[in-house]
């Protein structure tokens, strides 16, 4: 499973990238707005930190303007992945962009049939929102399982990018189902490294080693 960071915070991206375990980054207009910086500048800086895909989202809702915005975004760096909403115009834009060799992340997916349409449009990634799905009384992980089954049935190349990840259980369940990618806030990713028994084990080893009076 690939790990993407869902953030526009440069320091957090640098910290995660330094582990060698970060495969990409996803951003959206809300995350960019929080940074208080120019979106091109932020996107360019992120693209220089990570080698993998960096999702940058269009804000237009019509196909023609989406294409104009996508043209601006993809000139920022070679690893920019254009993010479009799962709408008719969004999928029309996806079809055109992927046909030209541009990576596209189709976002705001809330049903398996939407994901099917995204795959037919040639999406590089489809982003089902599991946390938000759960918030509205649905089963986010069942959505991921349904998409996985459909994609396997038809051998679609579109990667399932699990979004709106709230905690480690989401990551675990998505991995068990076979999702290709998960994107999560830095705090969630950093939490995956931790376990109380790991910490206790380290404390015990260090205490025992200190008693020997040795050094390495």
Curated annotation (Swiss-Prot):
Gene: tal
Localization (cell): Cytoplasm
Designated name of the protein: Probable transaldolase
Xref: InterPro entries: Aldolase_TIM, TAL/FSA, Transaldolase_3B, Transaldolase_3B/F6P_aldolase, Transaldolase_AS, TSA/FSA_arc/bac
Chemical reaction(s) catalysed: D-sedoheptulose 7-phosphate + D-glyceraldehyde 3-phosphate = D-erythrose 4-phosphate + beta-D-fructose 6-phosphate
Principal location: cytoplasm
Biological process terms in GO annotation: carbohydrate metabolic process; pentose-phosphate shunt
Enzymatic class: transferase
Family: Belongs to the transaldolase family. Type 3B subfamily.
Function: Transaldolase is important for the balance of metabolites in the pentose-phosphate pathway.
Enzyme Commission numbers on file: 2.2.1.2
UniProt KW Repressor keyword: no
Domain of life of the organism encoding this protein: Bacteria
The UniProt record lists the keyword NAD: no
Species assigned in the record: Sphingopyxis alaskensis (strain DSM 13593 / LMG 18877 / RB2256) (Sphingomonas alaskensis)
Molecular function GO labels: aldehyde-lyase activity; transaldolase activity
Pathway participation: Carbohydrate degradation; pentose phosphate pathway; D-glyceraldehyde 3-phosphate and beta-D-fructose 6-phosphate from D-ribose 5-phosphate and D-xylulose 5-phosphate (non-oxidative stage): step 2/3
Keywords linked to the UniProt accession: Cytoplasm, Pentose shunt, Schiff base, Transferase
GO CC term (a single one): cytoplasm
CDD domains: Transaldolase_FSA
Pfam families assigned to the protein according to its UniProt record, in alphabetical order: TAL_FSA (PF00923)
Gene3D superfamilies: Aldolase class I
Active site: residue positions: 83
